[in-house]
């Protein structure tokens, strides 16, 4: 029975807020522990703390701390990007959607994946050639430093805060289950590990934690997919035909369109996922860890390939769950429903193909996933405060490298404390909307500023500031007035804003506001900023003047 409890709560915790309806909510009681999961989890923690110690001996300068000295290779960075982005949420959530809806489950995996070609073709090269530590370096390259960096830092911190809350609650409840610890103690433990990785190891430790997590997740998913295909003689025709025979919907699971009841919400969600990815600060920061634009492009190429492979595996896993889990009464309750809900499908499949040992491995991988993400988020938040706000706005570029590093490390500790407090505060709250809101803000505030600053010569500080703030505020306000918060959280009968995700509308507001207030800007400063675009364009195309490798 303890295994079933663990499976149920793992599915509840890690089913993605964007891809599953169930929130991380309610009280989780302590359950008997899974010893295999604990052993593998402790091995992972010991390994990553060893890496942190190794990284701390090689992290001396500001460049080392923020970007690992620019010495990460394209392949390593691609693996780390994949590790930063592939989540246990998408692993469990998309597999569950395939299990319940068949072909339609691909809609969400495509939404997560399709943003990466945008990064590859529009952003990667110019971002690396123009920036140094954060994306605000790029946005403020020819615009006024103080207001643009303030806006960029605020956008980054809001996204980081929303992500951290979701991750801390999920990680805290997972550790609570695995160790039988009190939830508060579990959240504190996660916060301490997160701070240790970033405080002592900086970007180098964060990168290797993400690489290890990516390898483990890809191995686990590959093993499950191979075992599924082995059961059907490695024949996709057999896999799909047998699934259609077993599934209650029959042939309908191979037809698209069943999940998309509201095309406006679907479009808004798709836009948020596509363009929000290109505005996530912890993803954009990874481009500065490589030596030049060529390695930056290679990073996205490898990351996209690895993630495409991963989402392909989730499709096999979902159909495999129909065969090996859906047809097995051991995984059903008395009513015939899947134990723990449909989000259990992939984890039940792990038990079916690998037993309790492999279930323990998947549990440890789930926690590794959360640690990898929170480490990247914490470093992105710390760099926004120390590099963009403190060094560039408060000290107006006069801060010494040592001073900036000190502020960054203080910020890491502060973010750890805040993350712990918010994790405790939101223990019993519906936080499912937070990841959707984070993507919407990234798509509505960060992405328009980055894109237009690199490609539109008529952009001015006035336009960027107005459009960026309008996009951020519109995304937040519409999310509050929408069905998730206004009805489910606040308890009103009907939402004021009828759609669940605001990106479609908040992005329009951001781009129109930026365009309008830029073209109507007739100030001397605006004219000078337009003239500086040519020099920026040359730098963005050639990389002349960038620092690479250890000098970066």
Swiss-Prot record:
GO terms for cellular component: plasma membrane. Coiled coil: none annotated. It is found in: Cell inner membrane. It is a multi-pass membrane protein. One of its GO terms (biological process) is sodium ion transport. Pfam families: SSF. The chain crosses the membrane at residues 6-26, 35-55, 78-98, 103-123, 151-171, 185-205, 208-228, 264-284, 305-325, 357-377, 407-427, 431-451, 467-487, 496-516. GO terms for molecular function: acetate transmembrane transporter activity; glycolate transmembrane transporter activity; symporter activity. Keywords: Cell inner membrane, Cell membrane, Ion transport, Membrane, Sodium, Sodium transport, Symport, Transmembrane, Transmembrane helix, Transport. Transports acetate. Belongs to the sodium:solute symporter (SSF) (TC 2.A.21) family. This is Cation/acetate symporter ActP. It comes from Erwinia tasmaniensis (strain DSM 17950 / CFBP 7177 / CIP 109463 / NCPPB 4357 / Et1/99).
């Amino acid at each position: 029975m303890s295994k079933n409890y663990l499976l149920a709560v793992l599915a509840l915790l890690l089913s993605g807020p964007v891809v599953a309806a169930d929130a991380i909510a309610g009280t989780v009681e302590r359950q008997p522990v899974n010893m295999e999961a604990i052993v593998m989890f402790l091995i992972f923690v010991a390994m990553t703390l060893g890496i942190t110690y190794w990284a701390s001996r090689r992290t001396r300068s500001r460049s080392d701390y923020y970007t690992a000295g620019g010495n990460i290779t394209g392949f390593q960075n691609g693996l780390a990007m994949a590790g930063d982005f592939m989540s246990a949420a998408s692993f469990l959530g998309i597999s569950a959607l395939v299990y319940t809806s068949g072909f339609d489950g691909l809609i969400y995996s495509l939404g997560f994946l399709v943003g990466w070609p945008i990064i590859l073709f529009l952003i990667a090269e110019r971002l690396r050639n123009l920036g140094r530590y954060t994306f605000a370096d790029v946005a403020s390259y020819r615009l006024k430093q103080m207001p643009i960096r303030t806006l960029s830092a605020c956008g980054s911190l809001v996204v980081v805060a929303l992500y951290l809350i979701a991750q801390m609650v999920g990680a805290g409840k997972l550790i609570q289950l695995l160790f039988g610890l009190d939830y508060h103690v579990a959240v504190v433990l996660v916060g301490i590990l997160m701070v240790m990785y970033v405080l002592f190891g900086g970007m180098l430790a964060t990168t290797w934690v993400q690489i290890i997590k990516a390898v483990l997740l890809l191995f686990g998913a590959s093993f499950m997919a191979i075992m599924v295909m082995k059961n059907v003689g490695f024949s996709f025709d057999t896999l799909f035909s047998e699934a259609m025979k077993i599934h209650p919907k029959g042939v309908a699971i191979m037809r698209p369109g069943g999940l998309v009841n509201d095309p406006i919400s679907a479009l808004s969600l798709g836009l948020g996922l596509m363009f929000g990815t290109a505005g996530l600060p912890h993803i954009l920061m990874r481009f500065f860890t490589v030596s030049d634009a060529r390695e930056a492009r290679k990073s996205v190429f490898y990351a996209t390939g690895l993630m495409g492979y991963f989402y392909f595996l989730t499709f096999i896993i979902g159909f495999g769950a129909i065969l090996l889990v859906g047809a097995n009464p051991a995984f059903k309750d008395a009513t015939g429903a899947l134990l723990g809900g449909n989000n259990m499908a992939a984890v039940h499949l792990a038990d079916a193909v690998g037993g309790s040992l492999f279930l323990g491995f998947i549990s440890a991988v789930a926690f590794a996933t959360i640690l990898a993400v929170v480490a990247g988020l914490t470093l992105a938040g710390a760099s926004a405060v120390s590099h963009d706000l403190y060094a560039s706005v408060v000290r107006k570029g006069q801060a010494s490298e040592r001073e900036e590093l000190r502020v960054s490390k203080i910020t890491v500790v502060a973010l750890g404390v805040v993350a712990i407090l918010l994790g405790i505060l939101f223990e019993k709250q519906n936080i499912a909307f937070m990841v959707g809101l984070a993507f919407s803000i990234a798509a509505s505030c960060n992405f328009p500023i980055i894109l237009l600053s690199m490609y539109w010569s008529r952009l001015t500080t006035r336009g960027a500031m107005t459009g960026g703030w309008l996009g951020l505020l519109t995304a937040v306000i519409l999310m509050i007035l929408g069905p998730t918060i206004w009805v489910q959280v606040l308890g009103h009968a009907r939402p004021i804003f009828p759609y669940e995700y605001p990106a479609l509308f908040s992005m329009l507001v951001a781009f129109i506001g930026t365009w309008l207030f830029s073209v109507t800007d007739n100030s001397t400063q605006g004219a000078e900023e337009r003239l500086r675009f040519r020099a920026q364009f040359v730098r963005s195309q050639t990389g002349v003047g960038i620092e690479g490798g250890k000098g970066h």
